[in-house]
Amino acid sequence: MQRLAHVDVTVTDLDLATAYYTEVIGMLETERDENSVYLKCWDEPNHHSLRLIYGPRVGFDLMSFKVDRDDDLEEFERRVLNYGFPVRRVSKGERVGQGESIQFETPSGQVMELVADLEMVGRATSPVNPVPFVEGLPGIAPPRLDHLL
């Protein structure tokens, strides 16, 4: 596993949660559909690192980790199955901003996901001589999700 890819959080007020994550935290909205808002930090190249999902309760639902390549998914699937946990395969295109993945549930009820292919949408800075911080962003404006948690 390389790093944290993204997390899914269920919220009861999608507009209020989106305002908090964009205005207070300083994340950038990359996409929205009827029940979800996708957000990322300014120094992240991928489509999103946080997905807010409208639902009847508040909760942390999924944590996704990036693996090197698709072949790794088969190896991790085998390992998870050997520990006795069922694995769900997710097809490319089933989840916004990513390719094929595997999902499994932890004993405490959270869904863990492993994914190899993530959609790249670019950073807010140039890859050549990037500035260390982008001026004028609202809120805290962390560079990456792993600097936010």
Could you say what each language-model-derived stretch is?
Residues 28-61, 111-118:
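Conserved short beta-strand elements that form part of the metal-binding/catalytic scaffold
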Residues 2, 8-46:
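Core segments of cupin and vicinal oxygen chelate
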Residues 49-59, 63-68, 75-81, 88-91:
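DNA polymerase sliding clamps and clamp-related checkpoint/processivity subunits
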Residues 18, 74, 112:
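Alpha-helical elements of the RecA-like P-loop NTPase motor core of helicases
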Residues 77, 81-144:
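Vicinal oxygen chelate
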Residues 1-15, 45, 60-65, 126-149:
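N-terminal beta-strand motif that seeds the catalytic metal site of vicinal oxygen chelate
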Residues 14, 70-73:
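Residues at or immediately preceding the N-termini of alpha-helices
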